[in-house]
Amino acid sequence: MSFDLRTRLDARRAEHLYRQRPLLQSPQGPQVVVDGQPLLAFCNNDYMGLANHPEVIAAWQAGAERWGVGGGASHLVIGHSTPHHELEEALAELTGRPRALLFSNGYMANLGAVTALVGQGDTVLEDRLNHASLLDAGLLSGARFSRYLHNDVTSLASHLEKSVGDTLVVTDGVFSMDGDIADLPALAQAAKAKGAWLMVDDAHGFGPLGANGAGIVEHFGLSMEDVPVLVGTLGKSFGTSGAFVAGSEELIETLIQFARPYIYTTSQPPALACATLKSLQLLRTEHWRREHLASLIQQFRQGAEQIGLQLMDSFTPIQPILIGDAGRALRLSQLLRERGLLVTAIRPPTVPAGSARLRVTLSAAHSKADVQLLLEALEQCYPLLDASESTEPVHA
């Protein structure tokens, strides 16, 4: 009996859900070249505009000269270098916590944290719109796993009443496909009332949120007691790559001992840590980046509402335009691309059926003129959806 892979692939195509990889032929930034076509991009997560910053590049180059280009071993063997340690200390300072621990990527950080903290006989409660890495972590932990209604503390409280063993409540800080933020004060209160821990993956909050860019916990003025487990990624606002978990001394030591995705993998290149240290410095000192980004978000929302687009409840750089049908979302993405703009159509299973959307993401590297070009193109293209049949573009 053979694997019938062709049938699975054909079904994806028929449902307008087939994915292909655009080939980026330039550095990240607002102006990119994709598959040979110059485009103005509104689809990366480089919120602070640091991915191609000359000082960050120079820090990476200097780090490679000093430390080489490979981690060489796992952290627990001989792969934990001085730049890694300095970056962990800087991230602990940013988050106001005693310790931080580096991971190679956000998926591994989430998987490592959840599976190290709970297992058989315990409970994991997750927002139903959490990132796939969090949902996978909950399922793989072996703990009793269930999802509460999106951002609904009443639903969470009902699940908490039925929890057993150690209970971990897990939520995104900023929800990556909707752009809305978790009601952390209410979630923290509900968790603490039942002796549960709250874990927040703030991948999209670090940078845009908080007075110093320290994310949603800083935005709400919460403490480590409110959010014992805080996860962040470095490949978005920091402009580099990797992830971290920040928390108490006991939490970090527990992860070092029990988080398998941390233990059984080679450390990231030390030069990458050098680059991230520089981007962290820029993030903390160049406050104009957050201010400029906030003004772009306001400009886009005002313009989109005037056009009559259906936006979602978001004041973050993630500004989804709800379309509904996957084919229509693909068509609008294609129409924009024909006008030199790159905005990705997001379809099931990434989002629920019937909620396909264009996911606009804004960056401090964008200009007001860039956003105006996008708004003008949307005003021209959106009415055309009803005038033509859905067709699948080359890349979506």
From Swiss-Prot:
Transmembrane segments: none annotated. It catalyses: 6-carboxyhexanoyl-[ACP] + L-alanine + H(+) = (8S)-8-amino-7-oxononanoate + holo-[ACP] + CO2. PROSITE patterns: AA_TRANSFER_CLASS_2. CDD domains: KBL_like (cd06454). Keywords: Biotin biosynthesis, Pyridoxal phosphate, Transferase. InterPro entries: Aminotrans_II_pyridoxalP_BS, Aminotransferase_I/II_large, AON_synthase_class-II, AONS_Archaea/Proteobacteria, AONS_Proteobacteria, PyrdxlP-dep_Trfase, PyrdxlP-dep_Trfase_major, PyrdxlP-dep_Trfase_small. It is an enzyme of class 2 (transferase). Disulfide bonds: none annotated. Its EC number is 2.3.1.47. Pyridoxal 5'-phosphate binds at residues 106-107, 176, 204, 233. It comes from the Bacteria. Its cofactor is pyridoxal 5'-phosphate. Substrate binds at residues 19, 131, 350. It holds the Pfam family Aminotran_1_2. GO terms for molecular function: 8-amino-7-oxononanoate synthase activity; pyridoxal phosphate binding. Pathway: Cofactor biosynthesis; biotin biosynthesis. The modification N6-(pyridoxal phosphate)lysine is found at residue 236. Homodimer. Catalyzes the decarboxylative condensation of pimeloyl-[acyl-carrier protein] and L-alanine to produce 8-amino-7-oxononanoate (AON), [acyl-carrier protein], and carbon dioxide. HAMAP family: BioF_aminotrans_2. Belongs to the class-II pyridoxal-phosphate-dependent aminotransferase family. BioF subfamily. This is 8-amino-7-oxononanoate synthase.
